[in-house]
Regions:
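Conserved MFS/SLC helix-loop-helix module at the cytosolic interface between two early adjacent transmembrane helices
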Residues: 34-70
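Helix-loop junctions on the cytosolic side of multi-pass membrane transporters
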Residues: 154-168, 361-372
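Helix-loop boundary and gating motifs at the non-cytosolic
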Residues: 1-29, 190-195, 199-228
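Residue-level signature of mid-helix packing/kink "hotspots" within the transmembrane helices
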Residues: 29-37, 121-122, 233-241, 325-326
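Structural signature of the two symmetry-related core transmembrane helices
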Residues: 50-64, 254-269
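Cytoplasmic helix-loop-helix junction between adjacent transmembrane helices
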Residues: 79-119
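Juxtamembrane intracellular "pre-TM" segments in multi-pass secondary transporters
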Residues: 159-194
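Helix-to-loop junctions at the C-terminal end of transmembrane segments
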Residues: 35-47, 239-252, 336
Length: 373
């Protein structure tokens, strides 16, 4: 509801150069990176339910904090806290699904969960845009109340799915770091993560920068802009299954470069457009790339990983977003201040082309299980 417009809020509240405003996302990405690694051990040690509740209540407090923040350091602290609390709920839900669903049904369970989440993503920006175009404070309060209410529901009605085993050894953070060290020695995995991270830098520009870019330079208000992220969510809901049925007929290393090629096109469309419809078209183009690449890349990593380490490899693969978030928005802010408002999008297009080339370099690597059909 609020997240797509957060850069607008901080920009208008702080009245600082764009580079300073976008650098706040670095606080979020750094803490989110650390929390994503630690969350797995936390949910295994303390239980899924408790960690999820902490994440939801913590996020609620952060949203309330935005109402009172007036200085850069206060926003930085809140962004850091947001990055710490956010992954706790996500990792907890993933663990609960794994606990409740047998291995042969997990792919479908995660797919249904992703579709359900995107229903919220579709409705949230519309409601948020209507409220935030009038007052951000009410929007923050609604978001905080919703998160706290959901946390209370989980606390009261969700059962703990972690089975306590007296003699079983639980994975520690040290174990996860050791597996991460092993994964980083896998050159194909590292190349894959690097390729995906470059592509995700383009995505961060669309999700973090586009809203403030559209409002400050073209007067597109939150209530109208909200249809752009909503379009992304609706496309995921209605097109993901059909597109995956097509792409799974081909090797992942041939599919991923095709999907990645949509991202630089989206960047160029933003750069040359100056209207709502141009920005909407750019989001549609990028979303097609997401629909093609996201599930395919996940399958590639899963097939690349040792069978007993697939979950952790996928977890490490998810860190690509936080790396991209630490680079993309801050670089965009610097380019905006030092060159022009269009510079970040042309730079994003170049990075997108590099990601396509990087994905093409993976074609000589084809894990034995990558073909899904």
């Amino acid at each position: 509801m609020v997240w797509p417009f957060l850069t607008i809020y901080t920009s208008e509240k702080l009245l600082l150069p764009m580079a300073a405003v976008t650098s706040l996302m670095t606080f979020n990405s750094v803490s989110g990176f650390v929390a994503s690694i630690a969350a797995g051990s936390l949910v295994d040690y303390f239980g899924r339910k408790g960690i999820m509740v902490v994440g939801l209540f913590g996020s609620a407090v952060v949203y309330l904090g935005y109402i009172f923040a007036v200085d850069y350091w206060q926003f930085g602290l809140l962004m850091f806290a947001s990055g710490m609390f956010g992954p706790l709920y996500r990792v907890g839900t993933d663990a609960i699904l794994a606990d409740m669903v047998p291995p042969e049904g997990r792919a479908q369970a995660y797919s249904l969960f992703r579709m359900g989440r995107n229903v919220g993503v579709a409705l949230g920006p519309i409601l948020g845009g209507l409220v935030l175009s009038r007052t951000y404070n009410i929007g923050f309060m609604i978001a905080a109340i919703a998160l706290a209410s959901f946390g209370l529901i989980i606390m009261l009605f969700l059962r703990e799915t972690l089975q306590k085993q007296e003699n079983a050894r639980r994975e520690t953070l040290q174990d996860q770091l050791r597996v991460l060290s092993q994964a980083l020695k896998n050159k194909v995995f590292v190349r894959m993560v690097g390729s995906f991270t470059l592509m995700e830098i383009c995505a961060t520009l669309m999700w973090v920068i586009l809203a403030v870019y559209a409002k400050q330079n073209y007067g597109i208000q939150e209530s109208r802009y909200s249809w752009i992220p909503t379009t992304n969510a609706l496309m995921v809901i209605f097109l993901q299954v059909g597109i995956t049925r097509i792409t799974q007929k081909y090797p992942e290393t041939k599919v991923m470069p095709v999907g990645a090629a949509f991202y630089p096109v989206a960047m160029i469309l933003v750069a040359i457009s100056g209207s709502f419809w141009g920005f909407l078209l750019a989001m549609v183009v990028m979303t097609f790339g997401e629909l093609i690449t996201a599930p395919t890349a996940t399958a590639f990593v899963a097939n690349l990983a040792p069978p007993d380490q697939r979950g952790r490899y996928l977890g490490f693969f998810g860190l690509a977003w936080y790396v991209a978030l630490s680079v993309g928005p801050m670089s965009a802010g610097f380019l905006t201040d030092s060159i022009s408002i269009h510079a970040p999008w042309y730079a994003g297009a170049i990075i997108g082309v590099v990601s396509v080339v990087a994905f093409l370099s993976l074609r000589k690597f084809e894990p034995t299980e990558t073909k899904l059909a």
